[in-house]
Amino acid sequence: MKERKVIIKTGLNLENSYTSLPEIFFTRQSPSRVPSPKLAVLNYSLITSLGLNAQVLQSADGVEILAGNKTPEEAIPISQAYAGHQFGHFTMLGDGRAILLGEHITPQGERFDIQLKGSGKTPYSRGGDGKAALGPMLREYIISEAMNALGIPTTRSLAVVTTGESIMRETELSGAILTRVAASHIRVGTFEYVSRWGTVEELRALANYTLQRHFKKGYDKENPYLFLLQEVIEKQAELIAKWQLVGFVHGVMNTDNMTISGETIDYGPCAFMDVYDPETVFSSIDIYGRYAYGNQPNIATWNLARFAETLLPLLHINPNEAIKIAENAVSDFTKLYKNNWLSGMRAKLGIFNEELEDEYLIEDLLSIMHKYGADYTNTFRALTFDNIEDTVLGGKVEFDKWYKLWQERLTRQEEAKLSSKQLMKSSNPSVIPRNHRVEEALEAAVKEGDYSVMEKLLDALSKPYDHSKEQDYYSKLPEPSTCPYQTYCGT
């Protein structure tokens, strides 16, 4: 398809460094034309931080670019190749419905991928139509922006446009395209792909590119590829800990959904936990609970082991030594994760200093919460504002005993009680994207064309630590239901 190159002053300052890699990593591919694109939602705060022109992006020409009907002059549209272990099984994948326009360089010199998701068939579509539905694209917009506000590394959503076409899934749905912004789209699955089907030199090219883009300090190290492995492990330890601290269940932790940059990616079957339960699963296809909330750290370790395997030819000339180096690096994940998680949990309880018994104090609280079906987010909110009596834990003897131990623990630090409260307020969100509130917003937008419900939700989610009365509506639990909430891989 001939590219429709245009000069439109959107503020996009595109480079195409990924195309400097060997051609095994991508295929030149233009977005498919759509009949009647209309702007559904535009992320003005992200536009500002990227140095883009909001007025132009929301104009007719800007919408044509966001829909893929027109291509910025500097863009070299590509779809990226990658593989992945999906539910433990290796398979060839790739961008089946996404086109990378290029890398936007911000006025501050930062580099971000600009990708159109739902932009048509690619060589990696595997029989799919390459399209996306409006509901799942809006859902990714909501959740990714909520994650960003919570301080969790994530891809961002710049815009969603409707395409004016219908797509067939179980039923007929409105088509849409999401503009995703990411530090990069390099995945563990990208390395798995070249490890399986490429040469060692192509693997080295990808590793060098990744070092240059994300870990430049690695060039000065004795073993830069070990440094790469260690940095990815550290970033994932930090990321997974942050997920656990807010009760986020990703739902599809396949290796193609683990980024090298340490950002959360792919918001298909994800959801936030209400009642605390380590076995919480939302994805309709995760029937054995592989990606359950409590198993996410273990899956991260497994994924990182797959990443380490791809780097073996680069880690050492002796295969046995390479394996030892990789195993030692991956074995560090558990400690790194636990340190990050414990640090975050201490903050949620207003604890500044470290004591060996802290882990037992934390685990005892979680055990009590699990036993009585306490809401994860609202329990910590209640502890922050001293109104635990309003929760299911109020009046429970076990909790009262724990509470006394916690209060005693707070006396064993120099910081004043007021400082502890401030720490808790900045560590315990009052509002998360509750599943029923997200569905409420999506139903209004998709079925009725009313985006006001979504806009109000996004406003509340943008200030999770403000603890204002206006947020109370979004912190309320769903009505008791006999049907557990389920998610699907729509995004």
Curated annotation (Swiss-Prot):
Named cofactor requirement(s): Mg(2+); Mn(2+)
Enzyme class, broadest EC rank: transferase
EC number(s) from the headed UniProt entry: 2.7.7.-, 2.7.7.108
Any one GO molecular function term: magnesium ion binding
InterPro entries: SelO (IPR003846)
NCBIfam families reported in the protein's UniProt record: PRK00029.1
Name of the protein described by the UniProt record: Protein nucleotidyltransferase YdiU
Taxonomic source organism: Clostridium botulinum (strain Hall / ATCC 3502 / NCTC 13319 / Type A)
